[in-house]
Amino acid sequence: MKEAGFFLVVRFWIAPGGEEQVMRWMDGGHIAEVMRQPGFVWVKRLRMAEPDATGWSAHAMIYGIETRAHYDQYMGNHALHAKFANERAPFATKLRIERFAGEVDFSK
């Protein structure tokens, strides 16, 4: 397996009652489509131990990507991101998303 030199973390929160719909979308093809993008080598999904202050369940996706250039290519694919936004539209009020990315600067 290729090594990940760059990482994308997508934190997201799902409103009570919305988890089945959101996870069905993710597991039904969204994650696989992201993983087909050049340079994406692995993904982990986390369920956070505690909900947020409003009771929304907290989750995160951690994607291992070969290089920053692969990440930039993915982020520059506006058609793909528009497609994802369109797919999320039916449950947009049940989902909050925050993204951040970077390289490891410490590991033990």
PLM feature spans:
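Short, flexible turn/loop "capping" segments at secondary-structure junctions
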Residues: M1-F6, A53-G55
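Active-site-flanking beta-strand signature of metal-NTP-handling nucleotidyl enzymes
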Residues: G5-W13, M61
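Short amphipathic alpha-helical segments
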Residues: G18-R45, K83-F84
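A general secondary-structure boundary signal
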Residues: E19, M23-D27, A58, R96, ...
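An amphipathic, aromatic/His-enriched active-site/gating alpha helix that lines ligand/cofactor pockets
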Residues: Q37-V41, T54-W56, G64-A101
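Short, solvent-exposed loop/turn elements at beta->coil junctions and helix N-caps
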Residues: L46-P51
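Short, low-order "capping/linker" segments at domain edges
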Residues: E103-K108
